[in-house]
Amino acid sequence: LGGAILVFIFFGIVAGDTGMFSAYGVLNFLDVSANLGIIAIAAAMLMIGGEFDLSIGSMIGFAGICIAIPAIYWGWPLWMSIIFAFSMAILVGYFNGILVVKTGLPSFIVTLAMLFILRGATLAITRLITGRTQVPGLRVLIEDDPLAWIFATDTFKWVFTWLGSMNLIALRTDGTPLATGIPPSVIWFIALAIITTWILMKTRYGNWIFASGGDKNGANNVGVPVGRVKISLFIGTAVAATIFATIQVLDAGSADTMRGTLKELEAIAAAVVGGCLLTGGYGSAIGAAFGALIFGTVSMGIFYTDVDTDWFKVFLGAMMLIAVIFNNYIRRKVTESK
């Protein structure tokens, strides 16, 4: 939270007059933050449980194609294609989890392999069926679909219409508000942050997650179903990646085989900046949410200040390194005090 406040203050000073903190600008950086936050929260839950998922980014590309190809080339209703994509996500997540639990292999290795498998399969299948790496034409299928609106409809439009009528926010030349509503990614992000925080803080399953990541053997000895907990968390990261993919595919109106590249690293970085330990057993969903908010704000802040956007990656790496050093320092001090 402190880091997020400092970032807001900094860009309030250097970019306050650029439109970054107008209604439209705020929605822009909230949208970027929310998209990252959706997968960062799931990555944080898995990290608290003591594991990593490096296949999140590839799952985003794979899920997008699982929506686009059936809908465009096989004639499926869009809602059926979305359900198919989520079904495949559950299958991939379960496969990752069962491999880690049953073989004892490090999740780093298992999911790194899945990263290549999913990305390669996405490229090969898409080229085989379509002859290219992008699948356009989804936008016309969104209207009247009973499921797509959950991922593709801005909310609270009436609020922005009213604000525009009162001249409280920027308007287009035709008199309509520049900011038309809250993006679906923001709603999903807030909902996931609230639900996962409640799970971690208030439920037995949340206690199991902390126990599984903190001391797997000890948790097993007291009856915690560590294997099932870890498998469910891998399913969670795959499903979160599919939520991300569905929102992006329906917003862009097309699927791209390379979508989601390196997003797994950004998600892990946001979770670490939010306080998750790389060793497991400690962290929070709300911390990961603030980590994503920091990265989203910096990403758009760099754009608004006309700084070369390549510097965002430098910031990403520096923030993660500082967070890891700080987290290890705090952990060492806590251990010494005991």
Residue map of PLM features:
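Transmembrane helix-bundle core of multi-pass membrane transporters
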Residues: T111, L115-T203, S232, A255-T257, ...
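Hydrophobic alpha-helical segments embedded in the membrane of multi-pass proteins
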Residues: V32-A42, F62, Y94, F116, ...
